[in-house]
Amino acid sequence: MASYDVLVIGAGPAGYVAAIRAAQLGNKVAIIDKEFLGGVCLNVGCIPSKALLKNAEVAHTLRTKGEEFGFSFSNLKLDYASAVKRSRQVSDRLVKGVDYLMKKNKIDVHMGTAMLTAKDTVSVKPKKGEAVGHKAKNIIIATGASPLSVPGVEPDGEQVLTYWPAILQETLPKSVIIVGGGAIGLEFATVWSSYGSQVTLVEMLDRIAPLEDEEVSKELAKAMTKDGITVKTGTKLEKVEKTKTKVKVSVSGKGGQETLEAEQVLLAIGFRPNTKDLGLEQLGVKLGRRGEILIDDRMATNVPGIWAIGDVTAKLMLAHVGSAMGIVCAENIAGVETIRLDYSMMPRATYCHPQVASFGLTEAQAKEAGYEVKVSRFNFQANGKALGLADYAGWVKLITDSRYGEILGAHMIGPEVTELLPELTIAQMAELTAAEISRNVHAHPSLTEVLMEVAHVAEGHAIHI
């Protein structure tokens, strides 16, 4: 039985980052995962999906703007299988990188299913062989989350999919019904529609991207409809029936009930924390209503020596948030200076077309919180770089408090907006105002100029509108 200072269960972006930081701080560290290093994100989530989305961007450009760009072809061939193969190469490269980082930081890697048998002991059952116990002064749980199920609908990996088989399949569906208008549903809708699939997006709430600012949701629905995607909001999934060649989906909405048909259905309705069969209840670890592990600001559970980070805590199910939690957790274990994470100000990014990015309060949330809200906007149509890219739909919306100029949030839709967030989030964290952003000289021409421009708008001296 090996003994460690820190033992991490789960090797995704939260877990492996926590393991690295703990090792940097002088701890003897091990990490456990039942599937693979890098977790869902690197293997079947964030990373391969971004590779597919880049292929989709090129395909979309060739299909919709080829003539504008001066490309002439009589028979454009789009090979989806090649796109998937490229996404696997990107994923494999990064997973090998994580493996290297484990070796570099002298972190022991144990592959198998973990269970806590005591507050300082973890049993690891490999796919072959007997379970092995490991002792640890500190145990960090970073087991992630799994797709929510729909009552009466059983995914089979062929006709009814979740994200995992969907991202691995090399055959492009001729038609697909995507249930769920959040990030995963939106990104798959972009990929498949760009390659020519007939896509229907079904969302139970009254708008897609329901966690975003309402204006962003409306703009995105308009753009996706223009791209040939059928968007059905306020529509509930009732029943799924499979035949040999297609899937029939019964839905209900404002217009009553209807039956949709497609080759495949993708279920993308959210996630539940992976806390089952970990032995948490026996140790008295407190769980929340959704099964999430309850933690304090230090990432500590109610049981001394047991910590939790990432999606399993359901704080904010985003890979970068999990990584930040991992660093803070490792630093708290080591007793060194660290920070307190403000989950309300975390960056959020969706890589559909057009891209969506945001942080902080929406306009409605800011008003509800009692701020004297000032809304400033700048359109990409007035940005030279966006025009040069022939991708200028969308805008940036900045939310500030008119009394002090405090930055409360920002909401963006348009080209590469996911890359524009850090300037605003660090400004908010450093308590800068729109005045400082407006006076920060930005390279020209660049998409980042929209941030300077919207700050000028907020300050009452708009330049290019």
Could you say what each language-model-derived stretch is?
Residues 9-11, 17, 23-35, 40, ...:
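Flexible, glycine-rich terminal cap/loop adjacent to redox cofactors
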Residues 2-4, 20-27, 32-172, 200, ...:
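Glycine-rich flavin
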Residues 10-15, 144, 180-185, 270, ...:
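Conserved phosphate-binding and hydrolysis motifs of nucleotide-dependent enzymes
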Residues 108-110, 115-127, 195-297, 361, ...:
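A Rossmann-like FAD-binding core segment of flavoenzymes
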Residues 1-12, 172-182:
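Beta1/beta-strand and adjacent pyrophosphate-binding region of the FAD-binding site
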Residues 46, 143-198, 202, 281-283, ...:
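Glycine-rich dinucleotide-binding loop and its adjacent helix/turn
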Residues 156-172, 259-335:
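FAD-site-proximal beta/loop scaffold in flavoenzymes
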Residues 7-9, 114, 134-144, 178-179, ...:
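Short hydrophobic core segments
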